[in-house]
UniProtKB/Swiss-Prot annotation:
<comment type="function">
    <text>Encapsidates the negative strand viral RNA, protecting it from nucleases. The encapsidated genomic RNA is termed the ribonucleoprotein (RNP) and serves as template for transcription and replication. The RNP needs to be localized in the host nucleus to start an infectious cycle, but is too large to diffuse through the nuclear pore complex. NP comprises at least 2 nuclear localization signals that are responsible for the active RNP import into the nucleus through cellular importin alpha/beta pathway.</text>
</comment>
<dbReference type="GO" id="GO:0019013">
    <property type="term" value="C:viral nucleocapsid"/>
</dbReference>
<comment type="similarity">
    <text>Belongs to the influenza viruses nucleoprotein family.</text>
</comment>
<dbReference type="GO" id="GO:0043657">
    <property type="term" value="C:host cell"/>
</dbReference>
<keyword id="KW-0694">RNA-binding</keyword>
<keyword id="KW-0945">Host-virus interaction</keyword>
<dbReference type="GO" id="GO:0019029">
    <property type="term" value="C:helical viral capsid"/>
</dbReference>
<dbReference type="GO" id="GO:0042025">
    <property type="term" value="C:host cell nucleus"/>
</dbReference>
<keyword id="KW-1160">Virus entry into host cell</keyword>
<keyword id="KW-1048">Host nucleus</keyword>
<dbReference type="Pfam" id="PF00506">
    <property type="entry name" value="Flu_NP"/>
</dbReference>
<feature type="region of interest" description="Disordered">
    <location>
        <begin position="1"/>
        <end position="21"/>
    </location>
</feature>
<dbReference type="GO" id="GO:0005198">
    <property type="term" value="F:structural molecule activity"/>
</dbReference>
<dbReference type="GO" id="GO:0046718">
    <property type="term" value="P:symbiont entry into host cell"/>
</dbReference>
<keyword id="KW-0946">Virion</keyword>
<feature type="short sequence motif" description="Bipartite nuclear localization signal">
    <location>
        <begin position="198"/>
        <end position="216"/>
    </location>
</feature>
<keyword id="KW-0167">Capsid protein</keyword>
């Protein structure tokens, strides 16, 4: 990993800050969180939501989505230029759930985007507060990562669905800035690049003219982001080749899928941050907590602390298991969709089960679902320990991984061996090492084959008691390595549909 001197910390990305010391970073992240909280309180007042309704995660998602839509300049412009029937480009809305006579009712609300922007700016001292918007995008992205498996998207771009551990942030919008780029997995970046290359192959004018120049700049920028995620010289050199290609085509496509596979063993560094729903920040602000004064970090104890003291509710469909719904949201809150289940279970203090064993669908309720039998329950989002979130991929140890997911991407900085199935991964590397990247390919394959267990275990700190806020005494858990560790194992998760 490059030294901290050359990379801004995530919190600086998160708050667009220039170099700041730790205290300033904590304050600016706190300011961002406080702004989201104040906005949420104001929206609950506008909508006349009861305390319980305001703590309902479905209402939180609707309100978050409204403000993101209100600030989506590109889409707003597009909607105004291409008016579609029954869609007012100046309005935004969604379902709000209220408790009426002992039953949950759905009400569709509609607001002027201008009005939403005004409320947001007012909550953020008159600023656009883009960092806060990005923070909400990352929370939605983490929720999608825990809820859906991107099989179709992987297959469409010629990758193997078992590589899902590389797909963090695959549903993040393009406008999510540096903070968004930091949390995108290697597979996500590869997929974005492959989509561009495919368009270039099908559309002769894609790289030409004034528009093509902009496209080219975007392409090179994405290549550099991906290059920065790799930790070995050979992988980076291959990215230089892909970036410098005169006319990106099949050779680049091959190189990129090769690199994506190699990342299952020689892992990229992908940031993880705990982004919580607005309905957690709102009540905390309402209770008088001053995030800016106290300071806040997305990668330390703070989110765990906040969740220990928060009450969040969720609608539950008739045949869903509330404990499973809680697990889904807990994983989303800590960006742990691709973490080893043994590590997550240890930290959470209750067993975290694979996606295929969860009796719960996504958190959002579709507009055609019947509200009659809808219940609600408390989400259990507390944890037994806390751990620092990591931005490094760690390295891997030869351990069995599962049929549905052949590698993991660590979230918590906890020392362990990492599961992945070397034979499965290496089987993908038969054949093609010719062409202009042959020496790099050979070098990468050699590194993968010779990776020794100790090179490739994850050297992390350990977990901490919730009373140990200074992270003074790490507990290094021991894991039963005979067990299954991946979340999307033998999976039947729903597909993500935009």
């Amino acid at each position: 990993m490059a030294s901290q001197g050359t990379k801004r910390s995530y919190e600086q990305m998160e708050t667009d800050g220039e170099r700041q010391n730790a205290t300033e970073i904590r304050a600016s992240v706190g300011k961002m969180i406080g702004g989201i909280g104040r906005f949420y309180i104001q929206m609950c007042t506008e909508l006349k939501l009861s305390d319980y309704e305001g703590r309902l995660i479905q209402n939180s998602l609707t309100i978050e989505r409204m403000v993101l839509s209100a600030f989506d300049e590109r889409r707003n412009k597009y909607l105004e230029e291409h008016p579609s029937a029954g869609k007012d480009p100046k309005k935004t809305g969604g379902p709000i759930y209220r408790r009426v006579n002992g039953k949950w009712m759905r009400e569709l609300i509609l607001y002027d985007k201008e009005e939403i922007r005004r409320i947001w700016r007012q909550a953020n001292n008159g600023d656009d507060a883009t960092a806060g918007l990005t923070h909400m995008m990352i929370w939605h992205s983490n929720l999608n990562d825990a809820t859906y498996q991107r099989t179709r998207a992987l297959v469409r771009t010629g990758m193997d669905p078992r590589m899902c551990s590389l797909m963090q942030g695959s549903t993040l919008p393009r406008r999510s800035g540096a903070a968004g780029a930091a949390v995108k997995g290697v597979g996500t970046m590869v997929m974005e690049l492959i989509r561009m290359i495919k368009r270039g192959i099908n559309d002769r004018n894609f790289w030409r003219g004034e528009n093509g120049r902009k496209t080219r700049i975007a392409y090179e920028r994405m290549c550099n982001i991906l290059k920065g995620k790799f930790q070995t010289a050979a992988q980076r050199a291959m990215m230089d080749q892909v970036r410098e290609s005169r006319n990106p085509g099949n050779a680049e496509f091959e190189d990129l899928t090769f690199l994506a596979r190699s990342a299952l063993i020689l892992r990229g560094s992908v940031a993880h941050k705990s982004c919580l729903p607005a309905c957690v920040y709102g009540p905390a602000v309402a209770s008088g907590y001053d995030f800016e004064r106290e300071g806040y970090s997305l990668v330390g104890i703070d989110p765990f602390r906040l969740l220990q003291n928060s009450q969040v509710y969720s609608l539950i469909r008739p045949n869903e298991n509330p404990a499973h719904k809680s697990q889904l949201v807990w994983m989303a809150c800590h960006s742990a969709a691709f973490e080893d289940l043994r590590v997550s279970s240890f930290i959470r203090g209750t067993k975290v089960v694979p996606r295929g064993k969860l009796s719960t669908r996504g958190v959002q309720i579709a507009s055609n679902e019947n509200m009659e039998a809808m219940e609600s329950s408390t989400l259990e989002l507390r944890s037994k320990y806390w751990a620092i979130r990591t931005r490094s991929g760690g390295n891997t140890n030869q351990q069995r991984a599962s049929a549905g997911q052949i590698s993991i991407q660590p979230t918590f900085s906890v020392q362990r061996n990492l599961p992945f199935d070397r034979t499965t991964v290496m089987a993908a590397f038969t054949g093609n090492t010719e062409g202009r990247t042959s020496d790099m390919r050979t070098e990468i394959i050699r590194m993968m084959e010779s990776a020794r267990p100790e090179d490739v275990s994850f050297q992390g700190r350990g977990v901490f008691e919730l009373s140990d806020e200074k992270a003074a005494s790490p507990i290094v858990p021991s894991f039963d390595m005979s067990n299954e560790g991946s979340y999307f194992f033998g999976d039947n998760a729903e597909e993500y549909d935009n």
